[in-house]
Curated annotation (Swiss-Prot):
Family: Belongs to the bacterial ribosomal protein bL32 family.
Domain of life per record: Eukaryota
InterPro entries for the chain: Ribosomal_bL32, Ribosomal_bL32_plant/cyanobact
Protein name in the entry: Large ribosomal subunit protein bL32c
Protein localization: Plastid, Chloroplast
Organism of origin: Phaseolus vulgaris (Kidney bean)
GO CC term, one of those recorded: large ribosomal subunit
GO BP term, example: translation
Keyword Ribonucleoprotein: yes
Keywords: Chloroplast, Plastid, Ribonucleoprotein, Ribosomal protein
GO MF annotations, alphabetized: structural constituent of ribosome
Length: 53
């Protein structure tokens, strides 16, 4: 039968949680930055139609 290993320390848990949260923060920041550049029309890496007909 499988036996659980030693308990993960609180500090390790906090470090992992912080890294996980930072990852989400930077992803959201990138998405917001792209949305801003699309809105202002300064985007050089994303192609979209500027005019609606």
């Amino acid at each position: 039968m499988a036996v659980p290993k030693k308990r993960t320390s609180i500090s390790k848990k906090i470090i992992r949680n912080t890294l996980w949260k930072k990852k989400g923060y930077f992803t959201a920041l990138k998405a917001f930055s792209l949305a801003q550049s699309l809105f202002t029309g300064n985007s050089k890496s994303f192609f979209c139609n500027k005019y609606k007909r």
